[in-house]
């Protein structure tokens, strides 16, 4: 698997979702001949220090990230009918500026934006976008949800908005194939 890198990975720190433990994640990347691996736990960065140390100790490039929850309106809006469902977005750090911005976003999500989950909004993403790369995420991302709803143009507009927020070359559409029917449906559209 030379040249392939897992960029959307949930560890044991993604409660009720991730199962891989950090030492095993790093060891598996080595076994597969990968030179880097990311950690992108849901809404939290609890495991990044252990991950960074484990990867560095084994000669693997650690890519620090987080799968954030994006509020449908603003992170301060908390009306059940409109704000109870958030959208996923994967953020990866390109450099130390990105790391500091990701810490800021995740901290704001927990201290200001929490409503069912720690949430950020598009304005915060715009403000703290330097040094970050964004991926469109899983079926719970805004773009896949729009595609599933038959809203191709709205999905396209959201992709263009993310490209504008993060800058040219810093936003990517994510393809996943876990054998899920919905993924097979939207992947050709992505």
Across the structure, where does each feature detected by a protein language model lie?
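Phosphodiester-processing cores and adjacent nucleic acid-binding clamps
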Residues: 1-190
């Amino acid at each position: 698997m030379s040249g392939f890198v897992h960029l959307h990975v949930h560890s044991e720190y993604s409660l009720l979702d991730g199962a891989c433990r950090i030492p095993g994640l790093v060891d598996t990347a080595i076994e597969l001949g990968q030179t880097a691996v990311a950690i992108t736990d849901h809404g939290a960065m609890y495991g990044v220090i252990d991950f960074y140390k484990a990867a560095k100790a084994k000669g693997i490039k650690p890519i620090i990230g987080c799968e954030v929850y994006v509020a449908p309106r603003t992170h301060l809006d908390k009306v059940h009918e409109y704000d109870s469902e958030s959208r996923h977005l994967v953020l990866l750090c390109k450099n130390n500026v990105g790391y500091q911005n990701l810490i800021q976003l995740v901290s704001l999500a927990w201290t200001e934006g929490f409503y069912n989950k720690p949430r950020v909004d598009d304005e915060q993403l715009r403000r703290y976008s330097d040094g970050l790369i964004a991926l469109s995420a899983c079926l719970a991302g805004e773009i896949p949800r729009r595609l599933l709803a038959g809203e191709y143009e709205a999905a396209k507009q959201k992709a263009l908005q993310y490209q504008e927020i993060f800058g040219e070359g810093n936003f990517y559409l994510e393809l996943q194939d876990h054998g899920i029917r919905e993924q097979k449906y939207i992947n050709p559209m992505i």
